[in-house]
Amino acid sequence: MSWYDALWEDAPDPLPGFDVERRRAFLLEHVRGGERVLDLGCGEGDFAAAAAQAGAADVLGVDIAAEAVRRARARHPDLRFERVDDALPAEDASFDLVWCSEVLEHVLDTATLLSEARRVLRTGGLLLVTTPGHALPRRLGLALRGWERHFDPRGADLRFYTARSLRALLEDFGFEEIGVRGTGPHLFASARRAGLRARPR
């Protein structure tokens, strides 16, 4: 059993949400009718379902954890969910929008994840990312509540981002028009796949 599967085996069903309404609003702010949407790290599939309900023509959810995919298929049987390791099951430039919510902090190989996200996005397509922010207010809060619990080596979070480091990461992987804002304890980022043909506004 992989580390990711072990995390999901111990997770409550359904998984409790973190800033779910803010994250859903961020996604729906950008979904356009008729577009193809990839939910990268889909978990139980609720954001994929929200994109479909908002009018996306085709939605695919993928996750590395078999248990997550099982739950997503059970909760949303009319949508497509697949388990993946590294390469995404999609052609180059086949999606208009890639949604990656609360995933980057759990991934050791961010290079493969972001390279694949860029590969499957069409030129000018949009990547949306949410991740916990670790600017000064959060660090102070963690200090008060206990660093050890948050940075437990057996815990799920492997990486920690500030707005600056997240922006730099996306730039390094060929994204442009990058916007990062903090909302509550989370960072919300949007970025376009670099190229000549921009996504319609």
Model-found features: residue ranges?
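Conserved N-terminal segment of class I S-adenosyl-L-methionine
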Residues: 1-91, 97, 114, 129, ...
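Short conserved AdoMet
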Residues: 32, 108, 122
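Short N-terminal helix/helix-N-cap motif within the alpha/beta-hydrolase-1
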Residues: 67, 108-112, 139
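Acidic/polar helix N-cap motif
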Residues: 91-92, 109
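A short beta-strand submotif of the Rossmann-like class I SAM-dependent methyltransferase core
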Residues: 100-103
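Residue-level signal for the nucleotide or nucleotide-sugar donor/cofactor binding architecture
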Residues: 105-108, 161
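A short glycine-rich, Lys/Arg-flanked "PGG" loop and its adjoining helix->strand segment in the class I
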Residues: 111-123
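Conserved class I S-adenosyl-L-methionine
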Residues: 128-150
